[in-house]
């Protein structure tokens, strides 16, 4: 037995969380529920049994389903706070504190100890889903992390409890729940310069009435309607078209429709197909490590894209495969105006 509890104790021996300390090789277990203390004990990393003579340490209250993380010199204690098991009325949310020592004290962003009920919010009810709880961390690779948890109730799924996977971000050495990506129409903008991805077609000027800016208007001002696909598409070249980066002007050749491809997925999302909105011009990776717009969707791996938010909050867009190589490559800006892989 590693830990146990009786009915009249101030700690329930459930909801275990483990951390093998990468700095010392020591193995630690946190456990407990909302109705008492969260406790920490040390285990033998070889046997999994409790270290002889080790006494539990109280490290938090008002939470349960705890998990321990070590990162950048900090130990993190994540716990689930609030009420559970009441569907759409559940107030579960995930909170965190951190410490320079595994045994605490774990303190939140405003200096409150978790042993006194503190905790910085990581994720709460959102997007018609209530009661996020039971945090887990998965490091996919350097710079790409995911957090697993469940919602007590998803209003769009009959109020059922559902599994969730979100990007895990780090801001000022605090864990933050990343964004839930949705299909839609987007500008694809580079981090390098802020230019937008577009197909390489001629820029079509918009006509306007010219009045000197220093003269008071003589008639009511009219809104300028955005340029439409119908106005410009007929002049675009047929077949494959090159892709480039340029100033974003919300023109039709810069608006990308991102939709699930219906061809499998990866941890946290489906593969997507990406095309110019309203057309069949699909973003495609090439053997030359660049990208083009093909005039049709073939379903090839070079047209299937995984979209992930990285730990710094930026996004990575990466083809399932690039022709001629097994190397994992992502969409990047080579210089200000040239996209590549």
Model-found features: residue ranges?
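Short solvent-exposed loop/turn micro-motifs enriched in small/polar/acidic residues
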Residues: 9-11, 60-61, 129-130, 160-161, ...
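Beta-rich catalytic cores
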Residues: 12-15, 62-65, 131-133, 252, ...
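Signature of short aromatic-glycine-proline-rich micro-motifs recurring in repeat-based ectodomains
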Residues: 15-17, 125-139
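Residues located in well-ordered beta-strands
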Residues: 17, 67, 95-98, 136, ...
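Short, surface-exposed coil-to-beta transition loops
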Residues: 131-133, 161-162, 326-328
């Amino acid at each position: 037995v590693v830990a146990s509890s009786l009915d009249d104790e101030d700690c329930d021996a459930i909801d275990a969380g483990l951390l093998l300390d990468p700095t010392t090789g020591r193995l630690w277990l946190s456990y407990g529920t909302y109705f008492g203390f969260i406790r920490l004990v040390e285990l033998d990393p070889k046997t999994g049994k409790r270290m002889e003579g080790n006494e539990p340490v109280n490290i938090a209250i008002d939470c349960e389903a705890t998990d321990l993380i070590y990162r950048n010199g900090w130990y993190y204690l994540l716990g689930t706070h609030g009420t559970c098991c009441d569907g759409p009325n559940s107030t579960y949310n995930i909170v965190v504190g951190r410490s320079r020592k595994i045994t605490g004290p774990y303190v939140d962003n405003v200096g409150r100890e978790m042993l006194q009920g503190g905790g910085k919010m990581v994720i709460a009810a959102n997007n018609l889903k209530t009661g996020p709880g039971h945090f887990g961390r998965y490091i996919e690779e350097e710079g790409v992390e995911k957090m697993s948890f469940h919602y007590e109730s998803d209003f769009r799924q009959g109020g059922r409890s559902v599994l969730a996977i979100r990007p895990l971000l780090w801001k000022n050495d605090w864990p933050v729940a990343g964004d839930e990506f949705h299909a839609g129409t987007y500008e694809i903008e580079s981090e390098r310069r802020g230019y937008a991805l577009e197909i390489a077609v001629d820029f079509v000027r918009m006509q306007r009435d010219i009045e000197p800016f220093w003269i008071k208007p003589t008639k009511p001002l009219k809104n300028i309607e955005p340029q439409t696909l119908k106005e410009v598409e007929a002049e675009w070249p047929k077949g494959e078209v090159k892709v480039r980066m340029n100033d974003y002007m919300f023109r039709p050749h810069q608006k990308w429709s991102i939709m699930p491809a219906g061809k499998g997925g990866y941890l946290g999302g489906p593969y997507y197909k990406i095309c110019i909105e309203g057309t069949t011009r699909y973003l495609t990776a090439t053997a030359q490590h660049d990208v083009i717009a093909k005039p049709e969707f073939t379903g090839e791996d070079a047209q299937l894209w995984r979209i992930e938010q990285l730990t710094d909050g930026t996004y990575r867009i990466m083809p399932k495969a690039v022709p001629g190589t097994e190397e994992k490559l992502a969409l990047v800006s080579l210089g200000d105006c040239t996209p590549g892989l």
